[in-house]
């Protein structure tokens, strides 16, 4: 696994944009053969990205062939009827840890988990098994972030704000949550519904450690829909 120090990673990402490059099977850019996501990564790097967030073993392996940028890795795998699907069990952590990536992101919401563990117990098990691996908690509320930090994660990401039944539904990033997390002294990687450069600048000025932008850069269907809706 990657042995990068937390402070070294922060120095690499704190003043730039991490680009999320993903395509799920139901999305236009997904192909069974692969090969598309690395092209998005190359474009993002040429545009000045300081890091990449990516999903799946296949995509991450292909990405590592074309860039040396830091990678936040996840594996999206459904475990119905439970809702968490972002690196939801140790199985996914094991697969990601074998890829030698800088950060592994985990679902750290309070929702019922497939493995039956509490979030705190899951984090602690991961820390025991992979003590040098940097971890990012994908959360939707302040309380979830605080619990994850107490359990030992390195970063908290606002990835899931608006995507749990109990978090605020807003058409844009959860600025108030980001502000509160920064004021509490947490190492925040802001993510979720960041559609415009002005929003990224506002978030940067709050003191976050990193900013992840996905759909606004790498999902042309979503970008097109936003322009089409703007004409109505």
Curated annotation (Swiss-Prot):
Keyword Isomerase: yes
Keyword Transmembrane helix set for record: no
A cellular component annotation (GO) from this entry: cytosol
Pathway: Amino-sugar metabolism; N-acetylneuraminate degradation; D-fructose 6-phosphate from N-acetylneuraminate: step 3/5
Record key words, sorted: Carbohydrate metabolism, Isomerase
InterPro entries: Aldolase_TIM, NanE, RibuloseP-bd_barrel
GO biological process per UniProt: carbohydrate metabolic process; N-acetylmannosamine catabolic process; N-acetylneuraminate catabolic process
MF terms in GO: N-acylglucosamine-6-phosphate 2-epimerase activity
UniProt EC number: 5.1.3.9
Catalytic activity, reaction form: an N-acyl-D-glucosamine 6-phosphate = an N-acyl-D-mannosamine 6-phosphate
Protein origin, superkingdom: Bacteria
Alphabetized PANTHER family for the sequence: N-ACETYLMANNOSAMINE-6-PHOSPHATE 2-EPIMERASE-RELATED (PTHR36204:SF1)
Function of the protein: Converts N-acetylmannosamine-6-phosphate (ManNAc-6-P) to N-acetylglucosamine-6-phosphate (GlcNAc-6-P).
The family this protein is said to belong to: Belongs to the NanE family.
Designated name of the protein: Putative N-acetylmannosamine-6-phosphate 2-epimerase
Native source organism of the sequence: Streptococcus sanguinis (strain SK36)
Native organism taxonomy: Bacteria, Bacillati, Bacillota, Bacilli, Lactobacillales
Gene: nanE
């Amino acid at each position: 696994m990657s042995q990068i120090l937390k402070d070294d990673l922060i120095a690499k990402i704190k003043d730039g944009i991490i680009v999320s490059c993903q395509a799920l099977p139901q999305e236009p850019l997904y192909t069974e053969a692969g090969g598309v996501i690395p092209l998005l990564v190359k474009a993002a790097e040429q545009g000045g990205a300081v890091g990449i967030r990516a999903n799946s073993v296949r995509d991450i392996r292909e990405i590592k062939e074309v860039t040396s940028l830091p990678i936040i890795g996840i594996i999206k795998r459904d475990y119905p009827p439970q809702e968490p699907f972002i690196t939801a069990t140790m199985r996914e952590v094991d697969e990601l840890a074998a890829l030698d990536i800088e950060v592994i992101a985990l679902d750290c919401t309070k929702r019922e988990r497939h493995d039956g563990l509490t979030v705190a117990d899951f984090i602690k098990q991961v820390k025991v098994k992979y003590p040098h691996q940097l971890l990012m908690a994908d959360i939707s509320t302040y309380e979830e972030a605080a619990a994850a930090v107490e359990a030992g994660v390195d970063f908290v990401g606002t990835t899931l704000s608006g995507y749990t039944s109990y978090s605020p539904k807003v058409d844009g990033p959860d600025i108030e949550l980001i502000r509160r997390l920064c004021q509490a002294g947490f190492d925040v990687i802001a993510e979720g519904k960041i559609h415009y450069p002005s929003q990224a600048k506002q978030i940067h000025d709050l003191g976050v450690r990193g900013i992840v932008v996905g759909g606004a850069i790498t999902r042309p269907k979503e970008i097109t829909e936003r322009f089409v809706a703007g004409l109505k």
